Amino acid sequence: MVDFKADERLNTLNHSCAHVMAQAVKHLYPQAKFWVGPVVKEGFYYDIDLGDDIINDEAIAAIEKEMKKVCKEGKKIYRREISKAEAMEMFKDDPYKLDLIEGLEDGNISVYDQGDFTDLCRGPHVDNTKLCKNFKLVKYSGVYWKGDANNHVMQRIYGVCFPTPEELEEHLKLLEEAKDRDHRKIGKEMNLFMSDDLVGRGLPMFLPKGYTVWQELENYIKAKERKLGYLHVMTPCVGTVNLYKTSGHWDHYKDNMFPAMEVEGESFVLRPMNCPHHMMIYANRMHSYKDLPIRIGEIAHDFRFEASGTLKGIERGRHFCQNDAHLFVTPEQIESEFSQVVDLIFDTYKDFNITDYRCVLSLRDPADKVKYHDDDEMWNTAENALRKVLDDLGIDYTEEIGEAAFYGPKLDVNVKPAIGNEYTLSTCQLDFCLPEKFNLTYIDKDGTKKTPVVLHRAILGSLDRFMAYILEETKGNLPLWLAPVQARIIPVKNEDEELNAYSHELLSYLDENGIRVEIDERAEKLGYRVRAAQVEKVPYLIILGKNEVKDGTVSYRLHGEQATTTVPKEEFLAMLKDEIVTKSCYSQ
């Protein structure tokens, strides 16, 4: 996907097209008032107050029609500068523009004129509205003014604009592809998860089939961790505010946490992360240097108060389950343990055929003594240790100043999904700070107490986000071991007793041998039931008729294919079990 904000040519053009859209809206809705209309990575948008009118598909069509008129008229676009007082007078009837103007420094303010429309704007813009003719309004939504839930709702219209119709057409094709890959659409078609505003925004619920996928991911990563000596625990979803004051999260992360709850005179909070709980588990008993490293893992439920505008299905929610672990090590073990984590990340990526990723070493900003723990020696030691491992492993990475956690540097592995923007999937963070805050110690070789170092790491990140990622990469065509339903039996004729008996016999046979199988006996035509299985991305479709009953065989077809293969049921089972055991994965 093109980045409209980063591309200077597209940035200017889309900025101008936002004004064309605003002009068209003003023609159709004279009462309209406008907040901001910036260019973003995905194109442009404008936040609009239409009073009692609402935006719907019919309104979008009418706005596009009016925009075409504005472009066809080919009005010159002029920039002029006026004083702040003149701007206040010009926009005196628009409270949104007045709010913007009041926030500006004294001095001249730029406005842009195009025909009968004038807007407050820094620019730059193209010089004529006719240059904006290759546009498309792509979506609309309701948003809170200034992103504050305490404010009223405005209507946001998104669009894109290109220099040529060919570029626009190509982009619209990509948008359609993105819609087909959107994990929210796939999740609905496959009955994986749901959400409801009565439960709460950003609080998705996994349905039986979605939870099956979730459990398979959990089993997969926990098995890999157990082989490496991880010890799995379970800790509560809440903690006292004092716990998070001790860890420093209350000072550094409070804005991302849910409000505290008062219970019997004590303040509790939903946890945003699991480190404090795991620190307390380590502190539960005395440790010797011979015990280290100790690797504590958990599939943990976490809660973060994400802004409503950033919520996106199971990719980004206010509740999620983290594939979390904390490694308690001696200073001498830092490099070997960090190296093992990096190997685990890329071994996992190999299993899932994840190849499009970028490694980022996130470092502190030495000048920011407020955000970051103020210990230069600690930071230099930690950052150099991570650099050395990455260099020794020959891993390409970039460094980003000011992106570290408040307690230490980290390695983020960012993926570029099939749709949308890059985000972090896996992370490993080095921490000299938290063990000191919790007074964690171990008895060293010389009999003295020493403070361990902690590696925070998440391989799959959150299971929710990881599931969203693979759903979009595969368009829902999950590998057999991960598919919620691995095979579906469809008897050709539901009213045939002998056929129904064989169908249920096969159902029991496969189920008893560990295959996730179901039967579709609905009173629908065969073609309808086959199409339903295709939509739900069932990997193996079993079509049974009289011949299969007579021969004790299975006729199956793979998802997306028309060819049917007939084999003995024992051979079919062996084929499925082999594919599951080898964890054959998908091709992107």
What are these regions (language model features)?
Residues 1-35, 39-41, 47-588:
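NTP/phosphate- and nucleic-acid-binding module
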